[in-house]
Structure formats: structure tokens, C-alpha cells
Design a protein with these regions (language model features):
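An alpha-helix initiation/capping motif
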Residues: 56-59, 144, 148, 182
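Conserved interdomain hinge at the start of the Helicase C-terminal
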Residues: 179-193
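Conserved helicase motor core of SF1/SF2 NTP-dependent helicases
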Residues: 76, 83-175, 196-210
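Glycine-rich phosphate-binding loop signature in dinucleotide/nucleotide-binding domains
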Residues: 71-72, 100-101, 189-192
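Accessory N-terminal region flanking or inserted into the helicase ATPase core
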Residues: 2-78, 87-92, 107, 117, ...
Length: 213
């Protein structure tokens, strides 16, 4: 439900904060006090429900992993798509660095591809870490996936990002093409074959589903 999504977002962004729900209320501009009270009660009831039945949700695995310090022994630690990690997931990374015995930690990511801030991604942590002089940065200067036309557009769009890590890389040696598709001209094509439409929230899925029906 939408309320459960708000609770999970609060735990992802503020894993240690006792006032995590008030914090997330301010961010989501949730001004309905009745809804706030309902969410707070839902959080309490859900925690008790899971505890009584020994049930777990996605965020609970991170909470227990950090609490129990149940890190496996590792020689090397690799973290991919790091720009999408939440504050809670960064805690997991930090705990692994401390408890796993890893000799080196390799973290891969691209702040320009950070598209999950709405789901709690802590891009500021990623940027701060990349700017830390104690860390060694190894830029990947050659893309083997992006053609020239897409590289040109992506570079132009990236310049509008207010806070980012400056970077330069070369596209693959192919002009390629870029297409801008609109839902309207796609309507006819939706009559045939299988289509997958991705939406950010269940509410949008519902609206799209009703429209297509």
C-alpha cells in the first residue's frame, strides 16, 4: 500500500532515527494528520505482527544483518550500482568493510545514473565518498555500450545536474540513433504482442491499466 511504501522509505533513509516517520512526513509533504497517525499506528502494529510470527520484510533483512554483524569472511568486497544505495544499505557496506576482513573494497557507480532518490537512494553519500582524498578513483573512460548520438545527448543532459562528479568518457565507435517515443503513437501497437509498462507507483499503474482497458 502507499502507507507501507512511506514506512519502508523512512527505514531506508533514516535507519537509526527514532523520529524517522516525522522526517519522512516532512519530505513527502504529508499534511494529513489523520493519515500520519494511521501510518504511525500501522508501523507499530506491523512490527508487532512480524515479531509475533517471525516474519520479515525486505528492509528487515538489512536491519538484522547490521544488528547481528553477521558478515561472511571475504578477501575482496565488490559493490555495484552504488549510486542507488540507501542510507540503510550503506550501513551494510560499512559493516561489511569492518567485519568481513576484506583486504580491499571496490565500489562501482555513476552519479549521473542515480534515478532512485525517490526510493531512498543516498546519492550525497556516494558523491562525498568519491571526493574523499583517502579513496582511489579509477574512471572508466571508454564506453562499449553507448553510441555517439546517445553519448552527445546524455552529456548535454548531465550538464544540467546541479551537484555531480565531473567525468569524461568516450562512446563506442558507432553513430547509433536516438528515438523519442510518445504513448500516443504507441496506442496502435499495443494491440499486438506483449508489452511491459514500468511505473514508479502502484497508483500510476492503476491509472495506466484503467486507460488501456
Amino acid at each position: 500500500s502507499e502507507y507501507q511504501d512511506i514506512i519502508n522509505l523512512a527505514y531506508a533513509k533514516y535507519p537509526d532515527a527514532e523520529d524517522r516517520l516525522p522526517k519522512i512526513f516532512r519530505e513527502t509533504t504529508l499534511n494529513n494528520y489523520g493519515a500520519r497517525n494511521m501510518i504511525e499506528q500501522m508501523d507499530l502494529d506491523l512490527r508487532k505482527f512480524k515479531e509475533d510470527r517471525d516474519k520479515y520484510e525486505y528492509v528487515d533483512y538489512f536491519v538484522n544483518f547490521i544488528k547481528n554483524k553477521s558478515a561472511p569472511k571475504l578477501k575482496y568486497l565488490f559493490i555495484d550500482e552504488a549510486q542507488d544505495l540507501s542510507a540503510q544499505q550503506w550501513q551494510v557496506v560499512n559493516m561489511l568493510q569492518q567485519e568481513s576482513g576484506a583486504l580491499e573494497t571496490w565500489i562501482a557507480g555513476d552519479d549521473d545514473q542515480a534515478i532512485f532518490r525517490w526510493a531512498g537512494a543516498d546519492i550525497e553519500h556516494f558523491i562525498t565518498m568519491a571526493n574523499d582524498d583517502n579513496n582511489t578513483i579509477k574512471p572508466l573512460t571508454q564506453s562499449y555500450r553507448i553510441p555517439i548520438s546517445v553519448h552527445t545527448l546524455a552529456t548535454k543532459l548531465a550538464q544540467s545536474i546541479s551537484r555531480r562528479i565531473p567525468k569524461e568518457y568516450k562512446p563506442r565507435d558507432e553513430e547509433g540513433e536516438r528515438k523519442v517515443l510518445n504513448i500516443r503513437p504507441l496506442n496502435k501497437g499495443l494491440q499486438e504482442g506483449d508489452w511491459l509498462i514500468l511505473c514508479r507507483t502502484h497508483e500510476i499503474v492503476k491509472q495506466v491499466s484503467e486507460y488501456l482497458e
